[in-house]
Each structure stands twice: as C-alpha cells, then as structure tokens.
Amino acid sequence: MDIETQLRMLESRYRAALSAAVAAKAHYLALAGEPSATPNALERAKLAWQKLDARKRAIAARMGEIEELEQDAIV
C-alpha cells in the first residue's frame, strides 16, 4: 500500500475517532452534571472517553510517522 493510501485511510480513522471521542466527552460531561448519575457510571463514561481520546492521539502519531516517511522518500 502506498503512503498516500495509508494517509487517507488513517485520516478517515482519525475523523471517526475524533467524532467518537467528542461524543464520549459530551456524554461524560452530561453525566457529571446529572445529580442522579452513579459514581460507577461516571467512571465508565470517563474511561470510555479517555480510551477513545488515546486512540485518536495514537492515530495522529501514526499519521505523523507516515508523513515523515513520505518526506524522507522525497528527499
């Protein structure tokens, strides 16, 4: 698979991960403002948000690595 194809695929995954992370954060913040939310529910929501955010960051890091490879290939 060429570099451009890999980058397009990762960009698509990044957008999906970003959307999921934003939704998970919104869910967590909504629960945090809900007086009837249980501590367990808050913790689960926070962990889900953090997991998705970490995935987003990992994808961004991989995109950076591939872009560096592309620059090295050009030079």
Where in the sequence are the language-model features?
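Residue-level detector of functional hotspots within protein domains
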Residues: 7, 28, 55
